[in-house]
Amino acid sequence: MSLSGFEFSSIIAVLLLLIQLSSAAVLPVDYASQYGVASADEMTALPEEGSLFAERPAKRAQTFVRFGKRAQTFVRFGKRGQTFVRFGRSAPFEQ
């Protein structure tokens, strides 16, 4: 059985694709850390209600990348989703 270069490379490509898909299906995804949701362990570590340390945590800015004609990194914070380009120029978030 002789394989031409095209057949051999296509078989290798299919095998690599199958390996990648199977490993992606097996690995667990930590959605809590990915989306900024507190896990059960973090919730138990919070102080008791009425404690001196029971204050709301500081707001952290959410950084995200938008791909269009150019890849740009934005920082979003606030209730209304004000968005600022990371290198200083403001860019209002349009919905």
From Swiss-Prot:
Propeptide residue range(s): 25-58, 90-95
Signal peptide location: 1-24
Alphabetically ordered keywords of this record: Amidation, Cleavage on pair of basic residues, Neuropeptide, Repeat, Secreted, Signal
One cellular component (GO) term of this entry: extracellular region
Subcellular location per the Swiss-Prot or TrEMBL entry: Secreted
Main location: secreted
GO biological process assignments: cellular response to carbon dioxide; negative regulation of nematode pharyngeal pumping; negative regulation of striated muscle contraction; neuropeptide signaling pathway
Cystine bridges: none
Superkingdom of the source species: Eukaryota
Residue positions, PTM Phenylalanine amide: 67, 77, 87
Role: FMRFamides and FMRFamide-like peptides are neuropeptides. AQTFVRF-amide inhibits the activity of dissected pharyngeal myogenic muscle system.
Record-stated family: Belongs to the FARP (FMRFamide related peptide) family.
Name of the featured protein: FMRFamide-like neuropeptides 16
